[in-house]
Amino acid sequence: MTVLANLQKLYGGTYTEQNLLLSGTHTHSAPGGFMMDLLYDISTLGFLQETFDAYVDGITMSVRRAHENTRRGRIFINMGEVEGANINRSPTAYENNPETERRKYASNVDKTLVQLRFDSTEGQPLGALHWFAVHPTSMNNTNVFISSDNVGLASLLFEQRVDPGSLPGKVTHVASCHFAEERGCGSFVAGFASSNLGDVSPNTRGPRCEKSGLECDVSSSTCSRDERCFSSGPGEDMVSSTRIIAEKLLDKALELFNDRESSHEIKGPVRVIHQYVDMPQAVASVYDPQTRTFKKVSGCLPAMGYSFAAGTTDGPGAFTFKQATKTTNPFWNVVRNFLAAPKLEDEECQGSKPILLETGRLKFPYSWQPSIVSTQLAVLGDVAIACVPGEFTTMAGRRLRDAVSGAFAQKGRGKVHHVVVAGLCNTYSSYITTKEEYDVQRYEGASTIFGPHTLQIYLQQYERLAEAIAIGSPVDPGPDPPIFTKRLLSFITPVIFDSPKFRYGYGDVLLQPPREVTPGDKVMARFVSGHPRNNPRHGDTFLSVEKWTSNGTWAVVATDANWETRFEWIRTHKTLGTSEAVITWQIPPDVVPGDYRIGHFGDYKYIFGGVYPYSGFTRTFKASRGPAGASSRGSTPSGGYRGKREEGEVVEPASGYRSNTSKS
């Protein structure tokens, strides 16, 4: 809603709830505290306004850039199969679906990558948007760095292939588009968005016991008492696994992108429809095979099952919870009832789910999970995009595609040949499984918050939206979702002040990089730093890797958005407010020989008020493609660190390359 309000301030009624579709590309390695529903913010100690504002401002900026660079163009759709990039992490739940239904599909996950290619009318590629069913959990829950994971890396790699001179994002203070001769401006945009990934994992080696390496119990995903069960990816560690999955997506995406013959041009009008739904009040009809009649079913108040606390094989949970749990525990029931005891009608509504958290009755200090969700359907020519408010499992997504396609076919007004499930749209309401998967009560079923008939309600809701679009009939907007921004709580302390290390200034280098490096080396530098929460640096960067050019200037070759760089912030003293930034650059195999330096940019909070920028740079170091010590052409920049310290030695105060700070 805040993004929409921002856009309406800029463009009036151009953007509305009807036509603005926000679907998370999704990652499990990003700052939390922005969801507003309490359950989703508990792990981050509540709502964090700085994180919320950073996301809102970033999304608004992206839409604004797109709006102000609108061009006439053409859209093409193509699709292909990606092998070895995903597995089903709840196969026992999937197997509970009807055998006749499962026989229709070759796999228990969707392997199809769908691509929309955007070209200008002159044939210039403008962008490519993809949907593929895989969780962005290659970076596991031991990771402490912000990462866009496998789908984010695939996006970056795609952009670099199409526009090899570009930098991800924009570095306004050192490398704006006037450096286009050296580095491109990055006008091409690639994205890999979420689809029906609810039960889909990128950790293709499958679940194993942590110590013994034995297979986990297939039903409960457990091992012996002293072992955890988790899945791992195809690489030697989570970083290499992320890259392997990303490159699999990239390879197929590039193949589709360059295959003009099998691409189909999308022609026709753009139509969108949107409606809010109060899920606990929603009803649907289901067929009862015993009575051979249809009966009415309804949604439930939100609730989480016991298996929710067990986590998944991508990220195991806490305590002794197990997946596929269908009974309650007296101890945890006491804890549950202290918060909010479920009523008999709640337990009956949730069916086979033993309730661990009756979130629908938890209203203090505000809502724990949403009851009113956004549903939206967009149609581009003969392509329909079902924007769903959660994570649909493989079979749930397949049923949704069939339902939407069937609704358009029944009305017979403009055929829809392709239906895409766009996950995590507008509202997040956890998972959506089939009724059969729900009854198994794996993690996904326990997290299907509106009960066993959630999917059936959504199927009939999206059928109604499809029928309304097909005949050109409007729908009522539905109930307004609650707004409780004034009641949000946060237990995260704000940044009180920063102070530099004694006898140093902000941006001063504490650890210099080695003098000479070669491909594969990891170059590390450490700086005196302020708190990164002082400024999210939208369109900017916390670090730069710069190369000395033949025309006597520094050109940025990498920022904090590049995969080969890493920015680590460390609070060295909580009371004094001192901190350091550790910047790492892994030298790529295609590095251009020459002289380089690493820069750090940030802002510090002055103890008597105000936030002020600073910057600092390392000494110059030489990169070569051969053994260390190989020479490279070009003049040597002046002003760099030229002391006699050994490589990697800590820099003493008032030595080396000094920082630039600003305070007025």
Where are these regions (language model features)?
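Non-catalytic substrate/cofactor recognition surfaces at enzyme active-site rims
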Residues: 1-634, 639, 643, 663
